[in-house]
Curated annotation (Swiss-Prot):
The protein's role, per its UniProt record: Component of the transcription regulatory histone acetylation (HAT) complex SAGA. SAGA is involved in RNA polymerase II-dependent transcriptional regulation of approximately 10% of yeast genes. At the promoters, SAGA is required for recruitment of the basal transcription machinery. It influences RNA polymerase II transcriptional activity through different activities such as TBP interaction and promoter selectivity, interaction with transcription activators, and chromatin modification through histone acetylation and deubiquitination.
Complexes and interactors: Component of the SAGA complex.
InterPro entries in the record: Spt20, Spt20-like_SEP
Species this protein is from: Candida albicans (strain SC5314 / ATCC MYA-2876) (Yeast)
Bias type Basic residues, positions: 737-751
Record-given protein name: Transcription factor SPT20
GO-annotated biological processes: regulation of transcription by RNA polymerase II
Protein keywords: Nucleus, Transcription, Transcription regulation, Virulence
Name of the encoding gene: SPT20
Length: 751
């Protein structure tokens, strides 16, 4: 029993201890939570107090800014900085001026124009522009962008009392005695110099020029802020409201009595009458360009030969080659030079022979590498030589000289090259019209001279060692001189053809009338046995050996009749047309080579040109090896090696096409254009030949009469002695085809 009670008592004690411990832990937990809550509340209160303080400070700052008054006038700025030292000082004396009144400062005389100008700026309260650099160099301190100038006037001295401290001589006494002294000082006053727009500009220039660093955005903004604070103080940075979006904020105006009565009537009325709207048609792009030509051929050639596709590394010596054959001055000049050399050969003067030799030597031009300036210079030499020939051949000609076109050796390339070329083409066409009119006039004069009787045409030939010149050549020389030989045969207008036909009809009628009245007979020519030089027929200097056969009508040229003159004129025209065709070939070939060279230079760079030439040279050697079967060293090739060489040449050709497609495309376009031109020239030549044949068909009766007179001339030629035939070189003339009227006969050989 005792043990059980003891055990129960101990158990109750342990239970009581555990209960007391649990209560103490719970009370501690509750106290910790309360402390945390209190701390959080205190923190929240502190944050609220801080926010309130910040708001109050912001409100105070706003009110301070709103109530802050910027010093804008000169008096306000001077009052604001009255306790600060002045920016600079000026001392005025009786005889001179001085800045800062130091030993280093120079004495400025009273008559100096500089001080007069400075005093004008002081009166205007402006900073002198000339002082902008000095202000920065001497570190003059500005105040709100202005300069405070303190003036000391030594002319008006003011007496002021100054306290002076003096110590006693006895060491026992430490008291200082103060004594007043009267000192005269100059009168002083301050003034303000404000910046001007020009001084601000010079200030900015000084900063940007002298600064080694870049003009950064920070520096620009800082300068802008200083300028704004110095010039415009009260800034309104609020965004203006849109009146259309804020109609409700607009105050309503108080209506007056008169306006209230008429308000309803004026609502529907239009106060301002505007003019009627007009719709203007829009212009197309590039409508204002000066386009005088309409041919697409010209456009294609200009695009091919234009300098827009040139590489930047190309040299500037390459010039533009003009392609238009009908518009070039070289076409007419070369034609006239060649024809005039033929006519000038009829005269026996030595100057004509030398000039013709010079013109023949100038015709030879190199096939490759000929630049445009060289060819133009040679054409100019030809034109000069032919003008000298014309002057020596016909000194008594009455016809006015045909105006020539000045050729520029160098053509300027640039943006306005196309307009310049168009203007030149227009001028050349006008000159061609003038030349055509001169040609028609010369032909009319030649037809009128055909009506002269044969007795006046023949002149005694007593000179020895001189060529025989027939009268038809003399008559045709002025016409040939004034008649230009264009490079490209052109269509004649209907009016010109009608005028020609009428003139020929009149000449034929006169010839028929004179044939009926006069009987043609053989007239001996004087001086026939003394011939030793070459004979000139129809304006062409043609020499031949004694073995060459001669034409039948050529032997009868020494006794011309009126019936055979139209036929000779037609032969002369045909010979001139043939000479024109021969003259056209060489210039066209050189021009085509120039165009190809220009395209080659414009399409390829110098490095590409070298590569192209190397590949082309290799391809040519391989092709020659494949065709001949011999290497350049002289070794023979087998058939398989020949095929390999040909295949390699084809591969190189394909490689050229692949590497330079632009060049081959342009060359193909150029060939197509030249083919079109050749077809056009052939068509025009055929049309001209048909017109000439139609005009010559009307003179068939005259040709029959000339055929009847042929046996008489043959008998006359047989009657001549054989010595004259041996001494005279036989002349030949080119064969000309005629319809049913022309018969070829050979002279009987002399025994």
């Amino acid at each position: 029993m005792i043990k059980s009670e003891v055990l129960s008592g101990s158990a109750s004690k342990t239970v009581g201890n555990s209960i007391s411990n649990g209560t103490t832990v719970s009370t501690q937990n509750q106290g910790g939570k309360q402390n945390l809550i209190r701390q959080q509340q205190q923190q929240q209160q502190q944050q609220q107090q801080q926010q309130q303080q910040q708001q109050q400070q912001q409100l105070k700052h706003r009110t301070a800014l709103q109530n802050y008054h910027f010093a804008s006038t000169s008096e306000e700025i001077l009052k604001k900085y009255s306790k600060y030292p002045a920016s600079m000082s000026l001392h005025i004396f009786e005889t001179h001026y001085r800045f800062n009144n130091s030993q280093d400062s120079q004495v400025i005389p009273k008559d100096s124009p500089m001080i007069k100008d400075f005093m004008k700026h002081v009166l205007k309260e402006q900073i002198p522009v000339e002082m902008c650099e000095l202000i920065k160099d001497f570190a003059i301190r500005p105040y709100d962008g202005c300069i405070i100038l303190q003036v000391y006037d030594h002319r008006n001295m003011v007496k002021t009392a100054v306290l002076q401290n003096r110590s006693t001589s006895s060491p026992s006494k430490d008291q200082d005695k103060k004594q007043q002294m009267v000192v005269s000082k100059p009168r002083t006053y301050r003034t303000l110099l404000r910046p001007t727009s020009l001084s601000i500009y010079y200030d900015l220039l000084y900063h940007t020029d002298s600064a080694l660093h870049r003009f950064t955005d920070y520096l620009s903004l800082q300068m802008e802020s200083e300028i704004l604070t110095a010039t415009n103080r009260e800034l309104n940075l609020s965004v203006p409201l849109n009146p259309y979006n804020y109609d409700h904020l607009r105050p309503e105006p108080e209506p007056s009595g008169d306006m209230s009565q008429n308000s309803d009537e004026e609502i529907d009325q239009v106060k301002f009458q505007h003019r009627d709207a007009v719709e203007q048609p829009r212009r197309k792009i590039h409508q204002d360009e000066m386009v005088l030509h309409k041919s697409s051929e010209y456009e294609e050639l200009m695009l091919l030969l234009s300098n827009k596709h040139k590489r930047p590394d190309d040299c500037s010596d390459k010039r533009l080659v003009v392609v238009s054959t009908s518009a070039l001055p070289g076409s007419s000049l070369t034609g006239t030079s060649n024809t005039s050399t033929g006519t000038a050969a009829a005269t026996p003067t030595p100057t004509s022979t030398t000039a013709s030799a010079a013109s023949q030597s100038s015709k030879q031009t190199t096939a490759d590498g000929a630049s445009t300036t060289d060819t133009k210079g040679k054409k100019g030499d030809k034109a000069n030589g032919t003008s000298a020939n014309q002057a020596s051949a016909s000194p008594t000609s009455v016809h006015p000289p045909i105006p020539t076109i000045p050729q520029n050796s160098v053509r300027a390339t640039g943006q306005f090259m196309r307009l310049r070329l168009i203007e030149e083409i227009r001028k050349k066409r006008e000159l061609e019209k003038l030349q055509q009119e001169a040609k028609i006039q010369a032909q009319a004069n030649a037809i009128q001279s055909d009506s002269v009787p044969p007795s006046q045409q023949l002149a005694p030939q007593n000179t020895i060692n001189s060529p025989v010149v027939t009268e038809p050549t003399k008559r045709s020389s002025p016409a040939a001189q004034n008649q230009p030989a264009p490079k490209r045969a052109k269509k004649e207008t209907k009016k010109q053809l009608q005028a020609k036909a009428q003139a020929q009809a009149k000449a034929q009628a006169q010839a028929k009338a004179k044939v009926q009245t006069e009987t043609p007979g053989p007239t001996p020519v004087q001086g026939q046995n003394s011939l030793s030089g070459p004979s000139v027929v129809n304006g062409s200097n043609v020499t031949s050996t004694a073995n060459t056969p001669t034409m039948n009508n050529q032997s009868s040229l020494q006794q011309p009749s009126q019936a055979s003159q139209p036929q000779i004129g037609s032969l002369n025209n045909n010979q001139q047309s043939q000479s024109q065709q021969q003259q056209q070939k060489n210039p066209q070939q050189t021009l085509q080579q120039q165009q190809q060279q220009q395209i080659f230079q414009n399409s390829l760079t110098p490095e590409e040109q070298k590569v192209y030439k190397q590949i082309q040279q290799n391809m040519a050697t391989l092709a020659m090896m494949g065709q001949s079967g011999v290497t350049p060293t002289g070794q023979q090739l087998t058939p398989q090696q020949k095929q390999q060489a040909i295949q390699q040449a084809k591969n190189l050709q394909q490689q050229l096409f692949q590497r330079f497609p632009l060049y081959f495309q342009r060359m193909k376009q150029l060939q197509l254009i030249h083919q079109k031109r050749r077809l056009q020239q052939q068509q025009q030549q055929q049309q001209q030949q048909q017109q000439q044949q139609a005009s010559n068909s009307s003179g068939g009766n005259q040709n029959n009469s000339s055929n009847q007179a042929a046996p008489q001339t043959q008998q006359f030629n047989q009657a001549l002695p054989s010595t004259s035939e041996q001494s005279k070189p036989v002349t030949t003339s080119p064969e000309v085809k005629k319809k049913r009227t022309y018969q070829k006969k050979k002279n009987a050989p002399a025994n």
